[in-house]
């Protein structure tokens, strides 16, 4: 099932408390930005971005 941008944004805003995590997830899911670029923007490592996305992936997908 295909989910739209608005649905992803709604779920992320509703379930993800951390501003940093919300920003990382939106850049990845909504904008398709690579881990390295997100890491540069947020001042964290690409591995941390990957961990954020992996940590929240199940929650986001369950609530779509």
Where in this protein do the model-derived segments appear?
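Key DNA-contact positions within bacterial/archaeal DNA-binding proteins
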Residues: 47
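Short, Lys/Arg-enriched C-terminal cap helix and immediately downstream tail that follows
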Residues: 57-64
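Conserved tyrosine-mediated DNA breakage-rejoining catalytic core shared by Y-recombinases
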Residues: 53-54
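Short amphipathic alpha helix immediately N-terminal
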Residues: 17-31
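Short, Lys/Arg-enriched anionic-surface-contact patches
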Residues: 2-20
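Short alpha-helical "recognition helix" segments of helix-turn-helix
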Residues: 37-42
């Amino acid at each position: 099932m295909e989910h739209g941008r608005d649905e992803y944004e709604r779920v992320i805003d509703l379930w993800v408390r951390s501003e940093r995590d919300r920003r990382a997830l939106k850049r990845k899911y909504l904008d398709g930005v690579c881990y390295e670029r997100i890491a540069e923007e947020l001042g964290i490592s690409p591995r941390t971005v990957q961990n954020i996305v992996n940590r929240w992936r199940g929650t986001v997908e369950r609530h779509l």
